[in-house]
């Protein structure tokens, strides 16, 4: 606090021991400690009172808030050209809603519409080749969406 090193403090202690003697030195050290504590407390109280009077806390808060607001404005200016406006029109191609509705329908309701009858024989196995089934699509023509439910398959259990 005062820039006193250990050697200087030791020198002051030795001089006090020689001047006061071993009987009065502990009482003098205790009294000096109490006075130093009182001085510190009174100095801190005066410092807080002065800060309260001049409104240093309010000034600090105001400066801090102004700094934050200026940073927000700079950030808005930086990001404003990159972000689309909130009043922009909807995209021209909305996602297909009917396909999503068909896919979301429960499977057990479809099973209720099918009649349960005698077992039918399985269809004969046929060989498939990729050459016959896969044809490349043109880039300009849209590809039709696959059906949501293949009616040739038996219903799934819930």
Swiss-Prot record:
Cellular-component GO terms for this entry: TAT protein transport complex
Q: Which UniProt keywords apply?
A: Cell inner membrane, Cell membrane, Membrane, Protein transport, Translocation, Transmembrane, Transmembrane helix, Transport
Q: Which Gene3D superfamilies match?
A: 1.20.5.3310
Q: How does it sit in the membrane?
A: Single-pass membrane protein
Q: Where is this region: Disordered?
A: 73-158
Subcellular location, record wording: Cell inner membrane
The Low complexity compositionally biased stretches are 80-90
Regions crossing the membrane: 1-21
Q: Does Metal-binding show up as a keyword for this record?
A: no
Q: Which GO terms describe its molecular function?
A: protein transmembrane transporter activity
Question: Which one GO biological process term can you cite for this protein?
Answer: protein transport by the Tat complex
Please report a single Pfam family linked to this protein: TatA_B_E
Question: Which family does this protein fall into?
Answer: Belongs to the TatB family.
Q: How does it assemble?
A: The Tat system comprises two distinct complexes: a TatABC complex, containing multiple copies of TatA, TatB and TatC subunits, and a separate TatA complex, containing only TatA subunits. Substrates initially bind to the TatABC complex, which probably triggers association of the separate TatA complex to form the active translocon.
Q: What does this protein do?
A: Part of the twin-arginine translocation (Tat) system that transports large folded proteins containing a characteristic twin-arginine motif in their signal peptide across membranes. Together with TatC, TatB is part of a receptor directly interacting with Tat signal peptides. TatB may form an oligomeric binding site that transiently accommodates folded Tat precursor proteins before their translocation.
> What PANTHER family does the database record attribute to this sequence?
SEC-INDEPENDENT PROTEIN TRANSLOCASE PROTEIN TATA, CHLOROPLASTIC
Q: What is the recorded name of this protein? A: Sec-independent protein translocase protein TatB
Q: Which organism is it from?
A: Pseudomonas syringae pv. syringae (strain B728a)
